[in-house]
Amino acid sequence: MIDADLIVAGAGPAGLATALYAARAGLRTLVLDARPSPIDKACGEGLMPGAVRALRELGVHPQGQAIRGIRYTDGQNVVDAAFRHGPGLGVRRTTLQSVLLDRAKDAGVELVSSRAQDVRPDGDGVSVDGRRARYLAVADGLHSPIRRKLGLNLATDTTAAPRWGTRQHFAVAPWTDLVEVHWASRSEAYVTPVGPDLVGVAVLSSVQAPFAQQLEAFPALSKRLPLSGASSVRGAGPLLQQTSTRVAGRVLLVGDAAGYVDALTGEGIAVSLACARALVDCVAADNPRAYERRWLAASRRYRTITSSLLWARRQPILAPRIVSIAARLPRVFDAAVQQLAH
């Protein structure tokens, strides 16, 4: 007996967007997640203009702060690039997940408070803890347990230091309508306006240290922030996660579970939305094999730009000059930002 056309494992943004696209395609859809909502995690919380447009097409309109563009600064050099095709949006992760969840319920998606554990794919479908579907979309996060159980993990490069992300909010009015990226010797701090009196600060680094200690690398930023945060510190990592394939029979990976390079470019939600749409197209066409090609195409720009910037970040000669080079070549910086914003 078939319980659904598609079971989605994970009720984060990638999983819920997949469920919404599936419902729109007329597929019976079931979402499994045992975590209580709203689900929070370490996240830069900045939506690129392309992500804002994709969410609107799904009928999802989260409240947040308009973002006009991106600023890079290293304390001496500053370079800005404004989005050309509409604003981005700074929005709390919990707000985004809650709005997506409500929209999924309205669309007729069945939501079950249960963690997908016993996954058994076969030639005709997938059984998940006794529930049966034609396909399974795996959206259970960066360190996907299902991906690991199915043997789809690839070993990462051990010669490069792993990178980690941490995030905390501060009760202070945003001082700009740009996402500010502050560069230090071994880390970056992303400041995103997420409310009229609230900013989120996400630090990416190859150094593991308490959040307050991480902020010491950014003295100009630290002067603007209250001594105490307005939320608890959330962390994630190692960020680099590689997979052998996004398709294993009738099991398809989406979101961070499908593989992740780094959060340097802040494009995660936009890529997840594009890949969720591609996944549903392939499921609706009963052609899961096409998803690997569609995923590679949808994520190519993100993977190329992020990998290139990460490579530069790891070069002792280039790393201290990234912002100064961007400031001397503002048209190149602007072009890169427009590519990410698309």
What do the predicted segments below correspond to?
Residues M1-A14:
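Beta1/beta-strand and adjacent pyrophosphate-binding region of the FAD-binding site
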Residues I7, L20-C43:
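Glycine-rich FAD pyrophosphate-binding loop
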Residues A9, V138-A139, L253:
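Redox-cofactor binding/interface segments in oxidoreductases and associated redox assembly factors
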Residues R35-L58:
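Conserved N-terminal glycine-rich FAD pyrophosphate-binding loop of Rossmann-like flavoproteins
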Residues V52-L101:
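A conserved beta-strand/loop capping segment in the N-terminal third of enzymes
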Residues R103-L227:
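Predominantly flavin-linked oxidoreductase catalytic cores and closely associated redox partners
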Residues D118, A161, V207-V280:
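FAD/FMN-dependent oxidoreductases across multiple families
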Residues D281-H342:
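C-terminal helical "tail/cap" subdomain of flavin- and related membrane-associated enzymes
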